């Protein structure tokens, strides 16, 4: 992480500047970022408002290992957080970048476009899709969010039947979006980092797209949302010969005798086709 610290970065009005020099508009999450507006954050130990040291280190390892170009596919990209951070880090190393994101909320897509442009990332260097990542093509119902920057954890309804779609239309509660597979989004190109944060459907996505993952993806970084999913993902990927590089378990609280997620977990796996990194 220290290798990527932007020592020359300075604070700018109206944005929060992080340790990579990435500028983040405060309006993407006003309840947290308004108070930090115009500041430059320090090194994130143990973390910052966005992620902890485990996720930062896991993601940056993929940039460190890249040679002449860098491609990230962020599934559930929100405001383009990992696209922006890894894109800036890769460009600082002189790498050609290709940033691919899919997100269910259109307002978050607009935030992502703004954040990427604010950080000098040009239109030909990124691809954003308003849709839902899935194991197969079809339709999903995505909740209409009240202030998406302040509401996370929205779960789509995958492949709903006609009655469910009709009820959602009548209630005005969801928007209908296309489902995209990994192959749809990547166009068959190799991926340095697949970042998956899709609120509980991460296991289905990984299993359903694993043929493409096994041939295209060098590393997969997963934000987990239950201990069950962590264990199931670990078993599946380890059984396929993938190497575990980061394991920071989800933190749960006990609510009425049931675990409730408080902090997402972090898993990083390396493809068996990739050599062990040299530090």
Curated annotation (Swiss-Prot):
Gene3D superfamilies: Vaccinia Virus protein VP39
Enzymatic class: transferase
UniProt keyword annotations, A-Z: Methyltransferase, Plasmid, Transferase
Keyword check for Transferase: yes
EC number annotated for this UniProt entry: 2.1.1.-
Cleaved signal peptide residues: none
Xref: InterPro entries: FkbM_mtfrase, SAM-dependent_MTases_sf
Statement: the UniProt record of this protein carries the keyword Transport: no
GO molecular function, one term: methyltransferase activity
Pfam families named in the record: Methyltransf_21
GO biological process, one term: methylation
Domain of life: Bacteria
Protein name in the entry: Putative methyltransferase Jann_4284
Source species of the chain: Jannaschia sp. (strain CCS1)
